[in-house]
Amino acid sequence: MEIRAEEISEIIRKQIKEYGSEVEVAETGTIISIGDGIARIHGLDKAMAGELLEFPGGISGMALNLEEDNVGAAILGEFSEIKEGDTVKRTNRIVEVPVGEALIGRVVNAIGQPIDGKGPINTDKFGKVEVKAPGIVKRKSVHQPMQTGLKAIDAMVPIGRGQRELIIGDRQTGKTAVAIDTIINQKGGDVVCIYVAIGQKRSTVAQVVSKLQEHGAMDYTIIVAATASEPAPLQFISPYTGVTMGEYFRDNGKHALIIYDDLSKQAVAYRQLSLLLRRPPGREAYPGDVFYLHSRLLERACKVSDACGAGSLTALPIIETQAGDVSAYIPTNVISITDGQIYLESDLFYSGVRPAINVGLSVSRVGGSAQVKAMKQVAGTLRLSLAQYREMAAFAQFGSDLDKATQMQLARGERLVEVLKQPQYRPIPNEKQVLIIFAANNGYIDEYPVASLGRYESELYSFFDARKSDLLAELRDKKAIDDDIKAKIVSALEEFKKEFTA
């Protein structure tokens, strides 16, 4: 086939026109050593702290140590296929994770990839994993209640929206149970829940997911899982991934609740990373910035001012203690960062007081101003009564000849402790909690044996549901007990007293 001269010039013109001078420039480096989820890379001179790096096989990494001659990076994924001499690319982006409504109801890993087999997550919104917490001007004091559905907490250690309340205790004392009950109690409300599982067994996470599905709570819950079998970098980053997802709702005028279960394991993972990166160890071999690790995470939970959308992000971090030692390094750090703590005790747990909350050591520093007024009215004397009961019970062990007043106080205390017990996965609405505590405080349960109080409580709720639902509705709407409502409650309790037989 012959080509004429004018055609040649035409072809050349076309080629020149279509010629693209774009050359892809990527700054690359070479892995000089790798092991235990940490890679040292030579040649990435312009890398940023926290930058996303691209390893062979589509695996991501995060630049943590920027040294003179190399970069120390944590590999966010399986690193068995990566070897010395491999090429690593810069992405010029800080580590980001997907955020938005599309994540609700899903189970994702520490970098926001779905692991529940329900297909990809359809969202075009991404959030940076490391951002600064809102400043003072953007915040507002906590003033709305975050109901947990647990009588002992809502009455004596109330939590508000935007608060950080630590749940602390030994292993097997019901810490996760308190958190899961709080999630279940948000059903039908306007709170999006995020549960971050750090360093837990996969079977435990699967159990949590199935329990939440059973109670219809996955409809408003996101689960971020970095299980025990995953590398330390993923366990370290997962709480930041969770809080980034929560911030999306907070900044869009919505309310979110995030649970970190638990931050002790995140600190251990961070200690491992830091030691492998050759950062100098401090107390208990943790690095010097382990306080900052948790403070920058928990400061991102807050109540936002009306000008910024009036959203909120409430955090319930969990810390596991060893043999009740609250004065260890990580527990004291997190206690000082948070706005109060719920202390769970193994002695109480094994003696049948569940939730096993030690009322003397548990405190809520800001929740009082967020507590529902009706609850404040009935629970005002509760903490004092329980403290007096505990003191008397300690003395009563030594002597048997107690006067009548002391015996009555001990009997009342026993009944109060019994009333505050609650089975798992059965959160109670606020207005019903107010009723049972009102009955306990005003002596309506004093004449019944302690063993029959569980039945008294359930029958009382059934009685009010069936015959006094208008009073429950009034209490729910007014959120306070005025003289009129008080008279109605008293007459209803008197009516119930005639019907109930212990």
From Swiss-Prot:
InterPro entries in UniProt: ATP_synth_asu-like_sf (IPR023366), ATP_synth_asu_C (IPR000793), ATP_synth_asu_C_sf (IPR038376), ATP_synth_F1_a_nt-bd_dom (IPR033732), ATP_synth_F1_asu (IPR005294), ATPase_a/bsu_AS (IPR020003), ATPase_F1/V1/A1_a/bsu_N (IPR004100), ATPase_F1/V1/A1_a/bsu_N_sf (IPR036121)
Any one Gene Ontology molecular-function term assigned to this protein's record: proton-transporting ATP synthase activity, rotational mechanism
Catalytic activity: ATP + H2O + 4 H(+)(in) = ADP + phosphate + 5 H(+)(out)
EC number assigned by the record: 7.1.2.2
Highest taxon above the source species: Bacteria
Topological type in the membrane: Peripheral membrane protein
Keyword Flavoprotein among record annotations: no
Keywords assigned: ATP synthesis, ATP-binding, Cell inner membrane, Cell membrane, CF(1), Hydrogen ion transport, Ion transport, Membrane, Nucleotide-binding, Translocase, Transport
An annotated GO cellular component: proton-transporting ATP synthase complex
Keyword Transport: yes
Site for Required for activity, residues: S362
Compartment list: Cell inner membrane
Cross-referenced PROSITE patterns: ATPASE_ALPHA_BETA (PS00152)
UniProt-annotated binding residues for ATP: G169, D170, R171, Q172, T173, G174, K175, T176
Gene3D superfamilies according to UniProt: 2.40.30.20, ATP synthase alpha/beta chain, C-terminal domain (1.20.150.20), P-loop containing nucleotide triphosphate hydrolases (3.40.50.300)
Coiled-coil portions: none
Known role: Produces ATP from ADP in the presence of a proton gradient across the membrane. The alpha chain is a regulatory subunit.
Family: Belongs to the ATPase alpha/beta chains family.
Quaternary context: F-type ATPases have 2 components, CF(1) - the catalytic core - and CF(0) - the membrane proton channel. CF(1) has five subunits: alpha(3), beta(3), gamma(1), delta(1), epsilon(1). CF(0) has three main subunits: a(1), b(2) and c(9-12). The alpha and beta chains form an alternating ring which encloses part of the gamma chain. CF(1) is attached to CF(0) by a central stalk formed by the gamma and epsilon chains, while a peripheral stalk is formed by the delta and b chains.
Protein name: ATP synthase subunit alpha
Gene: atpA
